Every structure is written in C-alpha cells, then in structure tokens.
Amino acid sequence: MALRAMRGIVNGAAPELPVPTGGPMAGAREQALAVSRNYLSQPRLTYKTVSGVNGPLVILDHVKFPRYAEIVHLTLPDGTKRSGQVLEVSGSKAVVQVFEGTSGIDAKKTSCEFTGDILRTPVSEDMLGRVFNGSGKPIDRGPVVLAEDFLDIMGQPINPQCRIYPEEMIQTGISAIDGMNSIARGQKIPIFSAAGLPHNEIAAQICRQAGLVKKSKDVVDYSEENFAIVFAAMGVNMETARFFKSDFEENGSMDNVCLFLNLANDPTIERIITPRLALTTAEFLAYQCEKHVLVILTDMSSYAEALREVSAAREEVPGRRGFPGYMYTDLATIYERAGRVEGRNGSITQIPILTMPNDDITHPIPDLTGYITEGQIYVDRQLHNRQIYPPINVLPSLSRLMKSAIGEGMTRKDHADVSNQLYACYAIGKDVQAMKAVVGEEALTSDDLLYLEFLQKFEKNFITQGPYENRTVYETLDIGWQLLRIFPKEMLKRIPQSTLSEFYPRDSAKH
C-alpha cells in the first residue's frame, strides 16, 4: 500500500487517502486531512467561486479551510495570471487582495488557486545591479534571478537583546547633516520633504558620498564591494525613477544597487509589498552576505495612501484623515527592519523619503513616522525658494542617535559643543530676523546685528554647498568655527572654556 502510494507520488499522481465513512469522528478526520494537506503530493485547490470584486479586493465563497496570508494565483478568462494574498477569513469566505489590481476580473470565469504558502521572495547576491518591478519580477530584460533562498517578505523577528546600538557615524559629505544631525550606521532617519523640493537630489548625494568617519576593529571589510544600496520606489513618476537609475550609473555604483520600481501607472495595491520585498533583499545582503546596506524608500506617502485604499475597500473604521487606525503599527513593521545584529558584520541603514501633503508636518504620515524613526531631516520650501541647496532646515531636523556617534575617538571632541552652539545662534538669529521685520534694523542692539550677520553667513557658507561637493566632518567643523568667530568668546556660552581656548584662535584649523 505504502509502495503504491510512493509510486503515485513519483508519477505525479496524488496518493489515495482513506475516505472517512460516517461516525462522530468523520468530520474531525476530514478537517484534519484538509488542514494538513501536502501540496507536494496533492494537487492545489482551485475555485471558481468569486462572489464579488470591491476595489483591489476579491471575495470568494465556499473555500475549504482558507488560511490568513495565504498566496492565491488568479487566472483570468483571457489567460492572464495575477497574484493575491488572503487578507481576511470568515468561515468558508476569503477576502483576497490582488497585487496587480482587479480590472478585467470576471466573477464567473476567473479561477483562483490557493497555494497553501505565504508570500516569499527569491533572494540572491546576483540581485545587485538588477532592476525589478514592484512585485519583484525583473524588468531590465535580464534573466530570472537564480535564488539562493526564498524568504518571507514580512522578515524574521530580531531579538532586541541581539541588536547592537548604532555608534559608527556615517559621513554624508553634507554639512547640515554631518555637523548638526549626524547619522549612525544602522539608523533609520527619514527625509521630510514636499512636492517640488530636491529630496531626490539629497538622497542621491548621500548615496554617492556616504562612508565611515572612523573604522572600528570589529568590522572586517571596508571595501566598496562591501557596500550595497537597495532602492524601492512606490508611486513615483518615470522621471524620478530615471533620475536615480542614471545617477547610480554615472557614479559607477549601479553594480552595487538593487532597484524595485513601482511607478505611478503601476497598480496601487502593489505598493504595499514593494518596500517589504526591498527590505527582505536588504536583510539577506546584510545578515547573510555581511554587506552594509543603505535602503532608500520613496515615496512613503504613496505607500500610506495605498494602505488607506485597502482599508476603505474592506470598509474598516477610518482613523485620522481616513487613514486606518493600524497605520502606526504597519509603518513600524517597515521602519523597525533597520539596524545591526550581534555576530554579523552587516548593517541596514534606512532613509525613507516622504512628501508632506500641503507641507503639513502634523499630517498623520510624517507625524507617525516621526514617532517610530530616530529623527528626521527636514527639507524646507523657504530655503529652496531662496536658491539654497541643500535646503535643509536644521531647526526642525533631528538625529536621536547623534550623541553616541560623535565625540573624541569617533569624530572630534568639539563636535557636540560646536553643534549645540550653532543651533543656539541660528535659533536666536531667526528670532532677531522676525523682530527686525517688526521694529526695523535701527532698533536692534549690536548683539542682535551680530546674530543677523551669523544667520546670513550660516545659510550661505555652512548650509549651502554643491551637489557634488563632499565635505569631510573636519571641514564642516572648521566652517562652524569660522562662523562662531563672528561672536566674542563671552557670547559662546554653550562651549566649555577648555574647548574655546583650543579651537577659538585663528590657527585652530590645524587641529
């Protein structure tokens, strides 16, 4: 009997299973057989019981033991194949979210095959240098990736005890970031921007120039081959996608970049899986291949709107501005997949880009993102209108991990003090500028005029730099000292006397 069943499996047929015949145990036995169905030996279950289509969702009836998050393959009447995922299960009903959209689905003629597996993505080191669509299929006319592994796109939970606190500063070459909002390797820090601002140019500049300031002993390989970029675009236009692709090609880093592109004309629903595909690939490169991965996700606002669309189709109770109440949790499942893990040399640094609707930082998307991430880089429209690049407003910007990544032995011992003093002087300068608009320049004191001079030179010399100008952190600090010398020593109250006596004199540039 066992031998006959084995031959059946080899020949591609399903082994005959004993059929329950009546009795009180029959129903339980049938359920056990159905739940533990083995897809290697038994054919997959296919249904033509679509009862309705609502937005990106397909509702099926009379499904035998559907499972949450199970992948479903849909075949349309014209032979087109699409993929979906079970979002909700209620008895014999299943709600399936279709990644490629539901246009063209005929309720009577569409067949749905339940695979019995969750959504996995093939991963390989060969994915570097390749371009994929939002569902992970190659769109660069290259061959299908030969997978080294198939990983769950939701990722593996990381034991918090095994996380390493990010302490190595990444030098971006941008003074407003390196000097006052330093980024650590393994940090998640978003760029808060708005429509029409150069956030893509800033992200591309960070990709071009990013590198370690000090190389610690525990990291083995610092070669360029050990650095990788995973770029995920959600709902961006063709111009943005082409900009990043050409920028990576021009600076010779395309071989170390993996791109996932969901464009504005691609299905909205696909945007929900695009960042997860990118992060699963990044986790494989970081923790299996031990690479240092920079993940850029743009535009997270498009992702959140796709989430709202699914929520509305499911007729869930909406939260603020129509976004679902679980959006905070959902965003956390993306942002928290950054960091470093004990025993592995690799790391994942995340820079999500989001465009604030109507430049409103209190909008739910930037508001919830700010709670989860470790700071933000704020791109300001007023600075942009005055032709300042990069238009980073340092006052609302923040890096919560800066304190552990700077200082003696990591950057320079005066770094924290210079940053604090620059912040204080810039904030006072902004207040003086507002007061000048009310009372006029004649009513200002001599100290106020010094702050106004500092304000002008700070924006002109410190914040402003070229898109290909790569400043070291030491050059940034020296520019900071040049600006602080506008004030007499007595006015620099945020800097200790010992640091002032060492760096304030004109020849301190030699340090």
Curated annotation (Swiss-Prot):
Positions that bind ATP: R400
Keyword Iron-sulfur listed: no
Matching HAMAP family: ATP_synth_B_arch
Protein name: V-type proton ATPase subunit B, brain isoform
Organism: Mus musculus (Mouse)
Main location: membrane
UniProt-listed GO biological process terms: ATP metabolic process; synaptic vesicle lumen acidification
Lineage: Eukaryota, Metazoa, Chordata, Craniata, Vertebrata
Membrane topology annotation: Peripheral membrane protein
Entry keyword Ribonucleoprotein: no
Family: Belongs to the ATPase alpha/beta chains family.
Subcellular location: Apical cell membrane; Melanosome; Cytoplasm; Cytoplasmic vesicle, Secretory vesicle, Synaptic vesicle membrane
Phenotype on disruption: Morpholino knockdown in the whole cochlea, especially in hair cells and spiral ganglion neurons causes a dose-dependent hearing loss.
GO MF annotation, one: ATP binding
Record's keyword terms, sorted: ATP-binding, Cell membrane, Cytoplasm, Cytoplasmic vesicle, Hydrogen ion transport, Ion transport, Membrane, Nucleotide-binding, Synapse, Transport
GO cellular component: apical plasma membrane; clathrin-coated vesicle membrane; cytoplasm; cytosol; extrinsic component of synaptic vesicle membrane; melanosome; microvillus; myelin sheath
Tissues expressing this chain: Kidney; found in early distal nephron, encompassing thick ascending limbs and distal convoluted tubules and in the alpha-intercalated cells of the cortical collecting ducts (at protein level). Expressed in epididymal clear cells (at protein level). Mainly expressed in the organ of Corti and spiral ganglion neurons, in both the early postnatal cochlea (P2) and the adult cochlea (P30).
Assembly notes: V-ATPase is a heteromultimeric enzyme made up of two complexes: the ATP-hydrolytic V1 complex and the proton translocation V0 complex. The V1 complex consists of three catalytic AB heterodimers that form a heterohexamer, three peripheral stalks each consisting of EG heterodimers, one central rotor including subunits D and F, and the regulatory subunits C and H. The proton translocation complex V0 consists of the proton transport subunit a, a ring of proteolipid subunits c9c'', rotary subunit d, subunits e and f, and the accessory subunits ATP6AP1/Ac45 and ATP6AP2/PRR.
PROSITE patterns in the cross-refs: ATPASE_ALPHA_BETA
Pfam families reported in the protein's UniProt record: ATP-synt_ab (PF00006), ATP-synt_ab_N (PF02874), ATP-synt_VA_C (PF22919)
Entry function: Non-catalytic subunit of the V1 complex of vacuolar(H+)-ATPase (V-ATPase), a multisubunit enzyme composed of a peripheral complex (V1) that hydrolyzes ATP and a membrane integral complex (V0) that translocates protons. V-ATPase is responsible for acidifying and maintaining the pH of intracellular compartments and in some cell types, is targeted to the plasma membrane, where it is responsible for acidifying the extracellular environment.
